[in-house]
Structure formats: C-alpha cells, structure tokens
UniProtKB/Swiss-Prot annotation:
Residues 1-22, 87-95, 163-192, 300-312 are extracellular. It comes from Rattus norvegicus (Rat). It is a multi-pass membrane protein. The lineage of its organism: Eukaryota, Metazoa, Chordata, Craniata, Vertebrata. Disulfide bonds join 95-186. The gene is Drd1. This is D(1A) dopamine receptor. Its main location: membrane. Keywords: Cell membrane, Cell projection, Disulfide bond, Endoplasmic reticulum, G-protein coupled receptor, Glycoprotein, Lipoprotein, Membrane, Palmitate, Receptor, Synapse, Transducer, Transmembrane, Transmembrane helix. Residues 49-59, 119-137, 219-272, 338-446 are cytoplasmic. Brain, in the striatum, the nucleus accumbens, and the olfactory tubercle. Belongs to the G-protein coupled receptor 1 family.
C-alpha cells in the first residue's frame, strides 16, 4: 500500500555503486516476490486439492487471506520493483490503476487478518454458538464485507482523484502541478483527509480489534491450561498418595512441581505464539502507516517535521508488503496444511512415521485426564496431525451447555486458528484449533 511512491534514483551514489545497489535490490526484491507467490500459491492449491481443508469454515478466511496476498505479489510488488530498479516509473498512465490495486490488495490482506482474529475469538469463547452460526454463508458474508471495504477505499477515491492533495502555489508564483511528473515516478501525494481516513480503515481499527481479540484468546487459553494442569496434578496426587494400613488416615505427600512447570511452559508458548502473530503484523505495517499519516503534513522542505525521505518511505512500503510473504507461514503452517504441502511437493516420504501420531486429551467420567493416540499411514492426509487438543471446560456459556446436554449439538467443535498451534512439551503440540465441547460431567459431546 504505497500511494506516496518514489524511486531510488535520488540516493546520489556513484555510478558503479549505484549499479551494484540496483543489482542487489533486484535480487532481494525478486526473492521476496517469489517467496510470496510460492507460499500463497501453495495455500490455494492445498485447499483446492484436499477436500477436508475445504470442509473447515475457518479455512475460508485463510484462503481469502492467501488470495489477497497473492494479488499483492502479482499486481503490486513486481511493478514497484521495476520502478525501484529502473530508477523511474516506466508504465506511464498505469500509475493510477496500480495505486488502486495497491491500496485494495493491502487493505484486503489486513482486513482478512482482522476477520481471522474475530473468528478465532468467537470459536474459543462461545464454541457452541460458533458451531451453529458460523456457516459457510456467514463466512462468505464476512469475507465479502472485507473485500467490499477494500474496493470502496481504493478504486473509487483513486479514480475520482479524491486521494490526491490539492496543488499549492509557492511564494514565487511559479505553479508546478503534481501531474507534470506523474508519468515519470508515480508520485502521488495524499490529501490529509484521505491519508488519515484510509489508514484508520486499513490499519488502525483492524489492529485495535486484533489486539483485543488475541488478548482475550490468551486469557481463555490460560484458564484452560490451568484447569487441565489442576486435573493432572489431582490425578498424580491421588496415584502417589497411599493410606496407612492402621487407621486409614491419608499420608502427607509432596506435591510435584513438574505439573506447575509444565503449565507455565504451556502458557508461555501460547503467549509466544500470539506475540509472533501480532508482532510480525505490527512490525511490518506500523512504520508505513505512521509515515503515511505524517507525509501529508510535511511542508515543501524535507527538513521540516513530519518529512520522511523517499528511500526510508520505500523501505517502509516493502516492509508492509513483506507481511504477505509471512502470512502463509504463520496462518497456514498448522499440521493440516503441512501434510497437504508435503504431499503437493512430494516430500512426505522424508517424514518419519512417528510424526503421524495423533494424541488427544480427554476427561473421563471421574474427571481424570486421559491421553489416547493412534497412527496414520505415512503420506496420508489426516484431519488431525500430531496434536494435543485443549478442552474448553465450561468455556461456553451456561445456556449453551444446557442446550448441549439437552441434545442440541452432535458434532464436536473442531475449529480454532491454524496460527494458534503451539508446543506443549517436547513431544506433542497443543492446538487451540481443535476444541471439543464438554458437558458439566466432563464428557465430550458426541
């Protein structure tokens, strides 16, 4: 999303250094574009190829994100890279269309990230309600809203030139229109109104929503982990403690600290995962959107406050686009997609059979934690791969639980973000993606 663009021919480097710099820039930008294309194409191909990935409503949002990032890699990044390497904008009147695509695709990517965070929060905070109401139709409505907003704040203002700052007359009376140089550098100075309003819609409001949702998700996950840890400690305590043969009084037995350490490690890794999700997004896009709001307030002299030189601004632009190359790694590298990618790339034979173990945590009638596992044939695409599933005991509202006990919902809830898969211990993973509703008795609903 780079409406304020300029090329790097102002660096003032000697000819040889300038040529070397352009070569290095070309190599780096080519790798970035190719990695973005490869990652997002794999996500799209996996969803198209494997039916079980299409059966999950949450993957609709992941595929929408991949499409928006793929468009960034096809319609936006290559043309800016050409301008960076050539030192000028070589595509002439294509500038306005490119700017519109840039704003639309970047905004769609960010709004899809926001929708994913809301979807994940709803799935973990109200699993029964989520199972009933998050239908494919509801998902398509949310996706349509994200894309519609992206189009509305991009093509309409750009085509009507609402996004451009009004030309100013300098004190010497010599007027120079921004249009005079537009064919050479595609430099569009945004109006203050458009810069602030578009930044609010494209970034600041979505990032505020994401902070709230992921903070809430962490708190809910923390409660789940501590609840399971308490059940584990109770089971170990009951097993280790024996009664005396004489009077039957319980013998004092020491509490093991291993369960407390494991609980702390689980919470820490959940926090790390959520921090990576938010940290990558904010680090990539925040510098650009801060500068995007500052530049319209910059005066004619670059030494004034709010002014940013063209090279720094270009770096911020590419930082934002780099987020599109990282999204497939963060949001689509859960077990489901990893197996699909391995099959698509033909490298699943390199994976040992032990990696196909599926371990599930459940609670029996006595409230004890039970671990069960089975193995999948090597190379097969399983819905559940090498994960330990957290149980959201009493996460749903009491009203939802009553309806569930009355026989309302039959299917287990198998939804939470691919981005929220974290390691519990050295051998297994915990995934907030797979959450099965439980009743008051501690049993899974079936």
């Amino acid at each position: 999303m780079a409406p304020n663009t300029s090329t790097m021919d102002e660096a003032g480097l000697p000819a040889e250094r300038d040529f070397s710099f352009r070569i290095l820039t070309a190599c780096f930008l080519s790798l970035l574009i190719l990695s973005t294309l490869l990652g997002n194409t794999l996500v799209c191909a996996a969803v198209i190829r494997f039916r079980h990935l299409r059966s999950k409503v949450t993957n609709f949002f992941v595929i929408s994100l991949a499409v928006s990032d793929l468009l960034v890699a096809v319609l936006v990044m290559p043309w800016k890279a050409v301008a960076e390497i050539a030192g000028f904008w070589p595509l002439g009147p294509f500038c306005n269309i490119w700017v519109a695509f840039d704003i639309m695709c970047s905004t769609a990517s960010i709004l899809n990230l926001c929708v994913i965070s809301v979807d994940r929060y709803w799935a973990i905070s109200s699993p029964f309600q989520y199972e009933r109401k998050m239908t494919p139709k509801a998902a398509f409505i949310l996706i349509s809203v994200a894309w519609t907003l992206s189009v509305l704040i991009s093509f309409i203002p750009v085509q009507l030139s609402w996004h451009k700052a009004k030309p100013t007359w300098p004190l010497d009376g010599n007027f120079t229109s921004l249009e005079d140089t537009e064919d050479d550098n595609c430099d569009t100075r945004l109006s203050r109104t458009y810069a602030i309003s578009s930044s609010l819609i494209s970034f600041y409001i979505p990032v505020a929503i994401m902070i709230v949702t992921y903070t809430s998700i962490y708190r809910i996950a923390q409660k789940q982990i501590r609840r399971i840890s308490a059940l584990e400690r109770a089971a170990v305590h009951a097993k280790n403690c024996q009664t005396t043969a004489g009077n039957g009084n319980p013998v004092e037995c020491a509490q093991s600290e291993s369960s407390f350490k494991m609980s702390f490690k689980r919470e820490t890794k959940v926090l790390k995962t959520l921090s990576v999700i938010m940290g990558v997004f904010v680090c990539c896009w925040l510098p650009f959107f801060i500068s995007n709001c500052m530049v319209p307030f910059c005066g004619s002299e670059e030494t004034q406050p709010f002014c940013i030189d063209s090279i720094t601004f270009d770096v911020f632009v590419w930082f934002g686009w780099a987020n599109s190359s990282l999204n497939p790694i963060i949001y689509a590298f859960n077990a489901d997609f990893q197996k699909a990618f391995s099959t698509l790339l033909g490298c699943y034979r390199l994976c040992p059979t032990t990696n196909n173990a599926i371990e599930t945590v459940s609670i029996n009638n006595n409230g004890a934690v039970v671990f069960s596992s089975h193995h999948e044939p090597r190379g097969s695409i399983s819905k559940d791969c090498n994960l330990v599933y957290l149980i959201p005991h009493a996460v749903g509202s009491s009203e939802d639980l009553k309806k569930e006990e009355a026989g309302g919902i039959a299917k287990p809830l198998e939804k939470l973000s691919p981005a929220l898969s974290v390691i519990l211990d050295y051998d297994t993973d915990v995934s907030l993606e797979k959450i099965q509703p439980v009743t008051h008795s501690g049993q899974h609903s079936t």
